[in-house]
């Protein structure tokens, strides 16, 4: 299978001023999307050629030799053009302020990224700075592969809720740059054409889904990763968060005093219901990639709902500026909706790095308030900082108000000592393949029991 492979470079002059950003694509049989950003001190001798002058399309770059420059590598899973643009800006500003450090950014998409990250560390070739998620952190912390970041000056800027997630026994091994949200994308035009209201609670959502199913329309577009598991996590854990007993619940789960299925059956029962009723096309969802295939399907305008990350709202708008949609809270409660959130785009530093000081300087720069705000805004996400300003993207304002009112569930709470993100994804997959709920819950309990504390 052939996919487009992207390469991007930023060229920065001696004092760190950004001169040029080039983006090209080529067909390669790699089977993965790849994006690279390298910051180099160069003279850009090809500016006129890019404008149509010179000989052909050949670009000639002359490196400025500088033996005092230290290069650090940054590996991540943010590959989309709009994400890379913001990362380019932050890296360029860092280079300008720190002319003795050069940063090379490389990224892969989705699960391919985490597979590559694991292989690099297994081979002793881990990058200096890299992006992590909850499940990967469990393994890396158990192996002692991460640097304590508690000494960063920017730590004091994080909200109390985020610090509660970040601090473990007085140390911090990762820092979030965004708080992502998951919501119900609603096709306002289609709902209006069918005289259906935007659902605000579970009963209303069931009614609207039943109506569209009777019209021969599959109501909910779901992908094979984040859609159904976040639905299940939100419905299952919401009451614990509202009653401030999540600490006790997660402690019992970690110690094996309580079965994961006991907590998560309410959520996965709803997932099973939507699959069995045909509100979700399970077979199609199994082949649908998150924030990619699902977005393309949604902008066709043929389905009223889509379950995916709110950070894709800008991408949907860009795909069809005239498409009228809104991202609403998950209407999975009898009395309203909720938002599943995650401390996201987490950065960690490799303990085996030969340039730990430079890597720490870079992470500290990246987590300055102005950079966090810029990054979170671009991704239609929330800021993890005390003084963070909510995203101004108009399509996600319904989940902003829900978030601010505290009707939230953390999808990958740091208090959980087993890979909840992976387990719930695999449980969703088993249900989509037709497995009975009881069998899936039994499997999940067995997996959780064998994987507490990591892999």
Question: What does each of the following model-derived ranges do?
Answer:
Residues 138-145, 162-199, 217, 223-252, ...:
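Periplasmic solute-binding protein
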Residues 90-93, 97-161, 189-200, 296-297, ...:
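Extracytoplasmic "Venus flytrap"/periplasmic binding protein-like
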Residues 2-6, 12, 21, 46, ...:
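Conserved N-terminal structural module of periplasmic/extracytoplasmic solute-binding proteins
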């Amino acid at each position: 299978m052939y996919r487009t492979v992207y390469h991007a470079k930023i060229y920065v002059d001696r004092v760190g001023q950004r001169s040029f950003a080039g983006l090209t694509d080529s067909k390669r049989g790699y089977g993965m999307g790849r994006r690279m950003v390298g910051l180099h001190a160069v003279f850009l001798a090809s500016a006129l050629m890019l404008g149509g002058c010179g000989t052909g399309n050949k670009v000639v770059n002359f490196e400025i030799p500088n033996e005092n420059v230290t290069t650090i590598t940054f590996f991540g899973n943010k590959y989309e053009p709009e994400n890379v643009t913001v990362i380019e800006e932050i890296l360029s500003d860092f280079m300008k302020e720190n002319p003795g450090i050069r940063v090379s950014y490389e990224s892969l998409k989705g699960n391919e990224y985490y597979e590559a990250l694991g292989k690099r560390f297994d081979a002793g070739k881990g990058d200096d700075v890299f992006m992590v998620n909850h499940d990967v952190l469990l393994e890396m912390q158990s192996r002692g592969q991460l640097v304590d970041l508690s000494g960063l000056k920017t730590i004091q800027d994080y909200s109390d809720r985020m610090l509660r997630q970040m601090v473990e026994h007085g140390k911090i091994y990762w820092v979030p740059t965004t708080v992502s949200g998951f919501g119900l994308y609603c096709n306002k035009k289609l709902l209006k054409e069918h005289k259906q209201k935007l659902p605000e609670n579970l009963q209303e959502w069931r009614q609207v889904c039943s109506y569209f199913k009777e019209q021969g329309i599959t109501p909910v577009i779901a992908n094979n990763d984040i859609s159904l598991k976040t639905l299940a996590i939100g419905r299952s854990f919401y009451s614990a968060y509202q009653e401030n007993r999540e600490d006790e619940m997660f402690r019992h789960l970690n110690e094996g005093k309580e079965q994961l299925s006991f907590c998560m059956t309410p959520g996965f029962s709803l997932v099973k219901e939507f699959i069995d009723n045909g509100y979700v096309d399970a077979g199609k969802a199994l082949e649908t990639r998150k924030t990619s295939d699902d977005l393309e399907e949604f902008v066709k305008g043929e389905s009223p709902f889509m379950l995916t990350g709110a950070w894709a709202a800008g991408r949907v708008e860009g795909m069809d500026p005239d498409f009228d949609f809104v991202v609403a809270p998950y209407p999975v409660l009898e009395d309203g909706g909720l938002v599943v959130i995650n401390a996201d785009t987490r950065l960690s530093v490799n303990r085996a790095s030969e340039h730990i000081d430079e890597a720490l300087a870079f992470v500290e720069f990246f987590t300055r308030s102005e950079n966090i705000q810029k990054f979170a805004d671009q991704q239609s996400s929330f800021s993890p900082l005390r003084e963070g300003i909510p995203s101004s993207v108009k399509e996600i304002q319904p989940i902003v108000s829900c978030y601010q009112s505290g009707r939230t569930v953390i999808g990958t709470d740091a208090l959980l000592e087993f890979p909840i993100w992976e387990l719930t994804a695999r449980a969703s997959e088993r249900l989509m393949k037709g497995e009975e709920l009881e069998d899936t819950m039994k499997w999940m309990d067995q997996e959780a029991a064998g994987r507490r504390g990591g892999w």
